[in-house]
Structures are given as C-alpha cells and as structure tokens.
C-alpha cells in the first residue's frame, strides 16, 4: 500500500513560526543546529517523531494534532474488512 502524505509537516512548522513572529535563526538556536537545517525541515513532508516532538515543545505547539486528525479521517474512510 502506498503511503499518502496529506499533511506537509515542514510547511506547518514554517507557517506556525511565521505566525509567532519567530525567526529561523531562533528555531535553529533552540534546536542546536544551523539555520540551513531548519530550512531543510521546512521542505520535508514528514519528520522523525523525536524531532517533531522537540519542535513541538520548543514552539509550544503540538504538531502531532494535525497528524492525529488526518489519521483518524483516513481510518474512518477505510472500508471495514469483510468478515469470514
């Protein structure tokens, strides 16, 4: 089964950072990385859960909520398996 990327986590992080008026440099400093790494994060559809957790804590915003909502929608849309 092919995995669908309905949620683009990198774009969500970039949008939230902008809404909060925080800079890429600020997030890079908080993560302990170079700002080019943050720009690379913005380009990713998905992230390692540990990195997403760190970013969620740093930015005080639970990015997992978006994934949970989308996952539940996909579960609900999936047909029930046929009983034997």
Model-derived features with residue positions:
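A short, Lys/Arg-rich alpha-helix, primarily the initiator
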Residues: 1-22
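DNA major-groove recognition helix of helix-turn-helix/homeodomain DNA-binding modules
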Residues: 50-66
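Short, charged recognition helix plus adjacent turn
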Residues: 67-84
């Amino acid at each position: 089964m092919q995995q669908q990327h309905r949620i683009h986590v990198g774009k969500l992080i970039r949008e939230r950072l902008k809404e909060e008026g925080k800079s890429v440099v600020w997030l890079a400093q908080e993560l302990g990385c170079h700002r080019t790494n943050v720009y690379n994060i913005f380009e990713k559809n998905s992230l390692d859960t540990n990195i997403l957790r760190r970013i969620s804590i740093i930015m005080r915003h639970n990015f997992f909520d978006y994934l949970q909502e989308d996952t539940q929608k996909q579960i609900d849309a999936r047909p029930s398996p046929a009983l034997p």
